[in-house]
Amino acid sequence: MAKEDVIEVEGTVTEALPNTQFRVELDNGHNVLAHISGKMRMNYIRILPGDRVKVELSPYDLSRGRITYRYRS
């Protein structure tokens, strides 16, 4: 999947799930299942419920995504 194909949206983490996966409610009201990107994992960036995050969605499966950025609160 090329970088140009992703859809970037913002949302709020509502639930932390096992295996570094999170339930994220997007600004448009949809809920997606998202995992942490590799660079966030390498730099030990912690994500908690209530955090604002940027999520990349694939155009092929809009119910799953990758968390690429956690906004400062």
Swiss-Prot record:
Bridged cysteine pairs (disulfide): none
Gene Ontology cellular-component annotations: cytosol
Localization, UniProt: Cytoplasm
Alphabetic keyword roster: Cytoplasm, Initiation factor, Protein biosynthesis, RNA-binding, rRNA-binding
GO molecular function: ribosome binding; rRNA binding; translation initiation factor activity
Pfam family, one: eIF-1a
Top-level taxon of origin: Bacteria
Family annotation (InterPro entries): NA-bd_OB-fold, RNA-binding_domain_S1_IF1, S1_domain, TIF_IF1
Keyword Cytoplasm found: yes
Boundaries of every S1-like domain copy: 1-72
PROSITE patterns found in the cross-reference section: S1_IF1_TYPE
The UniProt record lists the keyword Protein biosynthesis: yes
Homology family: Belongs to the IF-1 family.
Function of the protein: One of the essential components for the initiation of protein synthesis. Stabilizes the binding of IF-2 and IF-3 on the 30S subunit to which N-formylmethionyl-tRNA(fMet) subsequently binds. Helps modulate mRNA selection, yielding the 30S pre-initiation complex (PIC). Upon addition of the 50S ribosomal subunit IF-1, IF-2 and IF-3 are released leaving the mature 70S translation initiation complex.
Annotated PANTHER family: TRANSLATION INITIATION FACTOR IF-1, CHLOROPLASTIC (PTHR33370:SF1)
Subunit structure: Component of the 30S ribosomal translation pre-initiation complex which assembles on the 30S ribosome in the order IF-2 and IF-3, IF-1 and N-formylmethionyl-tRNA(fMet); mRNA recruitment can occur at any time during PIC assembly.
NCBIfam families with a match to the protein in the record: infA
Protein name: Translation initiation factor IF-1
Gene name per UniProt: infA
